[in-house]
């Protein structure tokens, strides 16, 4: 059964009037099939390679970073041009060491990265972005049931602007 697109697309790169989506290859393949069937507008393009997304003023990533297998700053460097603004939502964080655990998605388990908040924010600043706003999403905090001594993670959002 093909996955549903709307909750799975995690990174949207806008370029008016068209939109460009980046996601994992399996999700992108499903999205392309849905576009071919007319379920998704033809103006929306799907990429599994950041370098092929084109330039954008705004990068919106919601729930992407915990599944991204490279540092976010490397993802930004892979784009044709760094966007002026970045809006991140649902970024899994903790105050301790960064770690990777497994998340159950349907019958599968997938790697799930939880970043160290201080290090992540320092990387963003070092890569040339100013954090203009940040917010907590308390309902997405969770504790790894097999490792409760690690404490709960938190979910954050960020609005950033290139310096």
Residue ranges of predicted features:
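A short, conserved alpha-helix within the catalytic core of class I
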Residues: 67-82
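Core SAM-dependent methyltransferase catalytic element
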Residues: 139-163
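Short alpha-helix
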Residues: 110-136
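Conserved beta-strand signature within the Rossmann-like core of class I S-adenosyl-L-methionine
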Residues: 82-102
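A conserved beta-strand element that flanks and buttresses the S-adenosyl-L-methionine
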Residues: 59-60
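Hydrophobic adenine-recognition pocket in adenosine-nucleotide-binding enzymes
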Residues: 64
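Short amphipathic alpha-helical segments and helix-helix/interface helices
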Residues: 5, 73-77, 117, 121
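Class I SAM-dependent methyltransferase SAM/SAH-binding core
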Residues: 1-51
């Amino acid at each position: 059964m093909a996955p549903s697109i709307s909750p799975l697309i995690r990174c949207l790169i806008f370029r008016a009037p068209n939109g460009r989506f980046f996601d994992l290859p399996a999700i992108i393949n499903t999205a392309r099939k849905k576009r071919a069937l007319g379920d998704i507008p033809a103006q929306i393009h799907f990429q599994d390679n950041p370098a092929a997304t084109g330039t954008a003023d705004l990068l919106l990533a919601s729930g992407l970073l915990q599944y991204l297998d490279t540092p976010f700053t490397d993802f930004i460097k892979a784009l044709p041009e760094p966007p002026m603004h970045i809006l991140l939502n649902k970024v899994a964080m903790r105050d301790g060491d960064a770690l990777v655990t497994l998340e159950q998605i349907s019958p599968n388990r997938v790697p799930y990265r939880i970043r160290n908040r201080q290090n992540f924010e320092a990387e963003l600043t070092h890569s040339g972005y100013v954090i203009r706003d940040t917010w907590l999403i308390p309902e997405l905090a969770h504790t790894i049931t097999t490792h409760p001594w690690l404490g709960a993670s938190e979910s954050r959002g960020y609005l950033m602007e290139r310096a």
